[in-house]
Amino acid sequence: VKKIVFSIFNDNVDQNHKSTNDFKLSQFKKWAPRLEFLQREYANKVGADYVLHRTNTTDYNSIQFEKIIQFEQYAEQYDAVLYLDFDVVINNNAKNIFEMIDLNTIGVYPLERMKLKGNHRDPEYSKLRSFLRQDNFDNQNIFCKTCAKNAMLLLDNQIGTNKLYNTGVVVGGSEVIKRLQFGENLESLNTLLDEARDDCLYPIEISKHFVYNNEVYVTYLIEKNNIPYTDMGIQWNFILDKFQKEPVDSAYFFHCVNKEFERTLL
C-alpha cells in the first residue's frame, strides 16, 4: 500500500481570521521546525511519504479549501492519504492510523452541535438562547456551521445530522476519497451555501454567519452522498482549546487549536 502524510503551511497568512492573530502566527514561526520534524518522523514510522506544502496562498479560508483539494489529488497517486493540520502534534505513543482506521471509509472526528449531556463543547440550550438574544454567534461557531450544512441539505430535501466533521485530521483510502468530489463541486457548493443563507429556516442571528467553509462542505458531501466514514475517536484528534487546555497521555494526535505548543512539546 502506497501511503502519504501531508500538511500545508504559510507563516504569512492574512490576519483576517481568529486563527491568524499575532500570537498564533508567532507560535507557528517559533515551533515550525519541531512540528514538521514530528509529522515527518511519524510518516516514516508508518511507512508513508511526507510532504509539507508551503503554500503561497495567504487567505486562511482558501488554504482550508486547498488542503481538501490536495487530499483528493493525492488519492490519484497513493492508495491511502492522511492529512494533518500543521498545528497537529504527534504524541510519541501514536499508533499506525493506516492500520487502525478502515481505509474503505473517510476517517474523521465529528463534533456534535448539541447534546443534553456529554462533550463539554456542546452548547447548552440556555446558552444558545443567550447567544441569540445578544447576537453573540460568529462564523466559526460549531452550531452555526452545522446549521449551514443542514440548511444546504434541506435545499436537497434531505435531513442532516447534528454532526460536523473536523478536518484537522482526515484519513482515507484512495477509492473513497475520490467519491468526495470536493474540488470539482466547489463552485456549486458556494452557490448552494449562498442559497441556504438567503432561503433559511434559521434566525438571521445564525444564518448571517453562514460562510464558505471546508468543514461545512465536507460534512455536507459525506451526508448527501452517503459516503462511508469512520468516527476515528477523540484520541486521533484531541483538540486543545479554551475548553480543554491540557494534553492527556492516551491521545495520539494533539490538535493545538490554541497554538499553545509548549503544553505538548516541552
For each feature predicted by the language model, list its residue ranges:
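N-terminal anchoring/stem segment of glycosyltransferases
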Residues: 1-78, 257-262
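Short catalytic/ligand-binding loop motif for oxyanion handling, primarily in non-cytosolic enzymes
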Residues: 14-15, 58-60, 90-93, 98-99, ...
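A conserved donor-nucleotide-binding helix/loop in the catalytic core
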Residues: 58-82, 91-98, 106-109, 165, ...
